[in-house]
Amino acid sequence: MSSSSSHFSSTAADLLAVFSSDNKDKSANKRISALKKAIAGISYGYDMSSLFPSVISSMESNNLELKKLCYLYLKIYASVKPTEAKRAVKLILNDIYSSNPMIRSLALRTLTSVNIKNFWVAAMDPIVRLLDDTDPYVRKTAAIGIAKLYSYDKKMVESSGLIDHLKEMLSDESSVVVANSLAALMNIVNSSTGFKLTFSREISNKLVKSLTDCSEWLQVAILDALIFYVPQKPGEAESFAERISPWLQHGNAAVCMGAVKVILYLTNYMKDDNRVKEYFMKTQPPLVTLLARKSSATQYVILRNIQIILEQCPEMFANDIHFFYCNFDDPIYVKLEKLDILTKIADIHNLDQILPEFVEYASEIDVELVRKSVKCIGYLAIKIEERKNDCIDSLIELMNTKVTYVIQEAVIVIRDILRKYPGSYKSLVPILYENLDSLDEPDAKSAVIWILGQYAEEIEDSITLLNDYLKGFFDEPLEIQLTLLTAVIKVFLKKPTAAADMVTNVLQWCTDEVNDPDLRDRGIIYSRMLSANPELAKKVILANMPPVNVGTGMYDPDTTEQLMLNISTLSSIYHKPPNRFVKGAQVAYCEPSPVLRLRTRDSNPSNTDSRESNHKKYNHFHQKSQTRRVMEQYDRNSWNPSPFSDESNSNTFSGKFDSADQENLGMPMTPETHLMD
């Protein structure tokens, strides 16, 4: 370390000695060598800021290589020594008027890269002039400089009209200038909440023409920007999609995915259902090609994007399921994504191929893969009603292996199956009895407790089994305590005489002895509901819920649309719209047009209807509000002293049930599911 320190110390000394030379032209090569060593020292973490005055004085040289090194040094240390850096502004402005286009471009790039007010204020006038420079390289640098200035001071750029200049540059004769102007414009759009961008057909055609003359990075920028083109007439979207199609075969994954995004975006403006499906299917081969690459990271990204696309076209891979079979050398995160996709594309026709795969995966060594496979089998039983018996038989077969984590995951999915098909598979309950001792995870125990409460009237030992779980009530996690409380109340509503002592103890524990506010509040709510009106309590606690549904649609249409417009971005990996994890990000949506295609909730391209997601969200909230109002009625209007409360109207349940209470609660109901899981 000491030898290295002395080396960079000597470099600084050499540089100072070179600058003190009277003949600057003869010492140019030495200064270049010394500056390279100084910048190398900076990369190793050494402080070279003491050379700042000497470097600034060297900027007057006409040597291009020396200027590049001086400008690089300036960009590194300008923020460290802003006062001294201001001296360099005049020298940079002199270079902007140089006859050499490389020097003009280099000077402007430096002036817009330093986040010091004197620098970017000084850049405002030159950048307007250089936007019309005769050299395309200088114009390209000026376009990128506008985006940099916008990141420093948005109001200054917006008021100066530079953004309008940037839009005009989309008609530049140079494809490189057009692509870089577009990249700068997109950068501004993505960092602004009030800036709206749309492209005319003429501009969009020019952008497509420039694709062939651009680098891969600029091709990606152009393809990302083409979603701001809004077709206005029938046939425009199809014609435009055909022009983009050749880039589906591009070797660069980012370019290929950019083309996929544009084509799928254009399907929103196609009226013919068959053409829509045709273009969805046209994107399948490039996706499969990318999926076949050896890079696991690339595979993961493609799989995450395919999941989003399947929201719009579930049948896209229905006949090509083998692409998503797990390979022995796939990392676990790739295998899990493949299982999700297989579950999505499964139907009555391909289940004979998918179900054996899941059963095989459930016999693997990897515990996470086994759990996911068992869960997927349960989802298939819910999704494909015609073949539910085959899926349930596979679950029973797996439970017979007596592998603990298999049993626990199977119990969880059996709960969902019972909710989906109430009254159809009660024969599964005895199988659960045989494996109760194997359940030690909270989710599995909660599932069994839910079943005991939901089917208490059909399970003879339900009270005994619940009492066994109640012995360790205070040692259980909150999730199980809440489930136990709800299950005990449901058992009491169905078997009031036998469960009276049990419900008394549990409500007393929850209202008097526990510290968790959620558990205590729920106990108080149940106590008030039972004391106010037992019959209404039945209607709330034993109310029917919407049946469990495991379909293709994971998201509402608005979210799906936003994800489709953000394919091949970080949003497609998170499966969240950008505005949910990036502050100030714009919400993407399809612009209105006479040919805009309207979708239904299932987002299937073969169906059309109006976008009613907001209305459906309101209806869903309205349903919950009705339940909330019923509970408020108990809390505010129907609270009267009863055997369930003491004379001071306390919030605790402290008394025994008399015969009248038991008689009132003696008629059990048989609901499809319960309310407060």
Swiss-Prot record:
<keyword id="KW-0254">Endocytosis</keyword>
<dbReference type="GO" id="GO:0030122">
    <property type="term" value="C:AP-2 adaptor complex"/>
</dbReference>
<protein>
    <recommendedName>
        <fullName>AP-2 complex subunit beta</fullName>
    </recommendedName>
</protein>
<dbReference type="InterPro" id="IPR016342">
    <property type="entry name" value="AP_complex_bsu_1_2_4"/>
</dbReference>
<dbReference type="InterPro" id="IPR011989">
    <property type="entry name" value="ARM-like"/>
</dbReference>
<comment type="subunit">
    <text>Adaptor protein complex 2 (AP-2) is a heterotetramer composed of two large adaptins (alpha-type subunit apl3 and beta-type subunit apl1), a medium chain (mu-type subunit apm4) and a small adaptin (sigma-type subunit aps2).</text>
</comment>
<dbReference type="InterPro" id="IPR016024">
    <property type="entry name" value="ARM-type_fold"/>
</dbReference>
<dbReference type="GO" id="GO:0032153">
    <property type="term" value="C:cell division site"/>
</dbReference>
<feature type="region of interest" description="Disordered">
    <location>
        <begin position="597"/>
        <end position="677"/>
    </location>
</feature>
<keyword id="KW-0472">Membrane</keyword>
<keyword id="KW-0813">Transport</keyword>
<feature type="compositionally biased region" description="Polar residues">
    <location>
        <begin position="636"/>
        <end position="654"/>
    </location>
</feature>
<comment type="function">
    <text>Adaptins are components of the adaptor complexes which link clathrin to receptors in coated vesicles. Clathrin-associated protein complexes are believed to interact with the cytoplasmic tails of membrane proteins, leading to their selection and concentration. Beta adaptin is a subunit of the plasma membrane adaptor.</text>
</comment>
<comment type="similarity">
    <text>Belongs to the adaptor complexes large subunit family.</text>
</comment>
<keyword id="KW-1003">Cell membrane</keyword>
<dbReference type="InterPro" id="IPR026739">
    <property type="entry name" value="AP_beta"/>
</dbReference>
<dbReference type="GO" id="GO:0051285">
    <property type="term" value="C:cell cortex of cell tip"/>
</dbReference>
<dbReference type="GO" id="GO:0030276">
    <property type="term" value="F:clathrin binding"/>
</dbReference>
<dbReference type="InterPro" id="IPR002553">
    <property type="entry name" value="Clathrin/coatomer_adapt-like_N"/>
</dbReference>
<dbReference type="GO" id="GO:0006886">
    <property type="term" value="P:intracellular protein transport"/>
</dbReference>
<dbReference type="GO" id="GO:0005829">
    <property type="term" value="C:cytosol"/>
</dbReference>
<dbReference type="GO" id="GO:0005634">
    <property type="term" value="C:nucleus"/>
</dbReference>
<dbReference type="GO" id="GO:0044732">
    <property type="term" value="C:mitotic spindle pole body"/>
</dbReference>
<dbReference type="Pfam" id="PF01602">
    <property type="entry name" value="Adaptin_N"/>
</dbReference>
<keyword id="KW-0653">Protein transport</keyword>
<keyword id="KW-0168">Coated pit</keyword>
<feature type="compositionally biased region" description="Basic residues">
    <location>
        <begin position="616"/>
        <end position="627"/>
    </location>
</feature>
<dbReference type="GO" id="GO:0072583">
    <property type="term" value="P:clathrin-dependent endocytosis"/>
</dbReference>
